[in-house]
């Protein structure tokens, strides 16, 4: 894995936690999963135990085991592995942060606690500071996802002077549609070498224009190659091509959102596209319906989003 001092950029797959039909973690497929991300999707950075990975539905012991398996299987294959260590309990977050450092992760990320919430910037920074201090050698990222946490403190406000309080702070996973807030984060901190990682896959091109340095998302598990094509087009200033790639990705996301799209459905799609069994989600989530899977499969076949990927009925080149 890369030096933790290397800036995190490009695509970062928010990894799924594979499970058996009985709801236990299926560690046996993680090595295959790593190879699939690198060799098929061209994605070499991962974000473990986040929303997509059902991190907050796992026990502390399970989260440690999952993190360790990804680090072990990703060694010399992945560039950077960031472990989400957020929890409702400060002590649990600190324990997870210490474990991430012990196993050789490249960074840690934390969401705001969302039951007994911090109601202002100072409260939130005090919490984040204590977690970061538990792993003082690791880069620290704030995971901003107000729609799920209910913590409405603007990221722009949080970033103001944050390195004075948290010296290891290196960036932000911004999972919100407020592009004004995101843009101000970039604009007011452009002299700092922060990683600005956008977390709304269907809006990534807009965020790139505003200065995003990378992206963390669930769709990069199975649409990583297509999204990388968009990044490459943007980099060479072929904005028309980049826009076409984004629109193509949006057509699929828009379709599945209308059907009902979340972690359960992400697992079903990843199983379908990769051939690696992701299993069901953990309760209270329910397994995606067969109707959803059939409809998603048909939509994937109708769009130019798949290259060198296998569906159940055989190899499917770009359709």
From Swiss-Prot:
Belongs to the DapA family. NanA subfamily. It comes from Sus scrofa (Pig). It catalyses: aceneuramate = aldehydo-N-acetyl-D-mannosamine + pyruvate. It is found in: Cytoplasm. It is an enzyme of class 4 (lyase). This is N-acetylneuraminate lyase. The lineage of its organism: Eukaryota, Metazoa, Chordata, Craniata, Vertebrata. PANTHER family: DIHYDRODIPICOLINATE SYNTHASE, N-ACETYLNEURAMINATE LYASE. Catalyzes the cleavage of N-acetylneuraminic acid (sialic acid) to form pyruvate and N-acetylmannosamine via a Schiff base intermediate. It prevents sialic acids from being recycled and returning to the cell surface. Involved in the N-glycolylneuraminic acid (Neu5Gc) degradation pathway. Homotetramer. Optimum pH is 7.6-8.0.
């Amino acid at each position: 894995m890369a030096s933790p001092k290397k800036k995190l950029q490009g695509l970062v797959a928010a990894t799924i936690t594979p499970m058996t039909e009985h709801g236990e973690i299926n560690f046996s497929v993680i090595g295959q999963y790593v190879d699939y991300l690198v060799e098929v999707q061209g994605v070499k950075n991962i974000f473990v135990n986040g929303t997509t990975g059902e991190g907050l539905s796992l026990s502390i012991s399970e989260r440690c085991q999952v993190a360790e398996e990804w680090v072990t299987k990703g060694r010399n294959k992945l560039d950077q592995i960031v472990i989400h260590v957020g929890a409702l309990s400060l002590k649990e977050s600190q324990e997870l942060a210490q474990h991430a450092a012990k196993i050789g992760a490249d960074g840690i990320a934390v969401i705001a606690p969302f039951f007994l919430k911090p109601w202002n910037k100072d409260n939130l920074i005090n919490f984040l500071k204590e977690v970061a201090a538990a792993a003082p050698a690791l880069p620290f990222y704030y995971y901003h996802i107000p729609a799920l946490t209910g913590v409405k403190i603007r990221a722009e406000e949080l970033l103001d002077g944050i390195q004075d309080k948290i010296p290891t702070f290196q960036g932000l996973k911004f999972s919100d549609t407020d592009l004004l807030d995101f843009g101000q984060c970039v604009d007011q901190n452009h002299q700092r070498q922060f990683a600005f990682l956008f977390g709304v896959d269907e809006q990534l091109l807009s965020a790139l224009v505003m200065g995003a340095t990378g992206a963390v998302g669930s769709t990069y598990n199975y649409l990583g190659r297509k999204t990388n094509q968009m990044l490459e087009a943007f980099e060479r200033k072929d904005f028309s091509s980049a826009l076409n790639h984004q629109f193509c990705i949006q057509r699929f996301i828009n379709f599945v959102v209308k059907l009902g799209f979340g972690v359960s459905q992400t697992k079903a799609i990843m199983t379908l596209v990769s051939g690696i069994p992701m299993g069901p989600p953990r309760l209270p989530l329910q397994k995606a319906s067969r109707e959803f899977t059939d409809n998603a499969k048909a939509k994937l076949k109708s769009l130019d989003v798949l290259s060198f990927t296998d569906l159940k009925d055989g190899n499917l080149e770009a359709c």
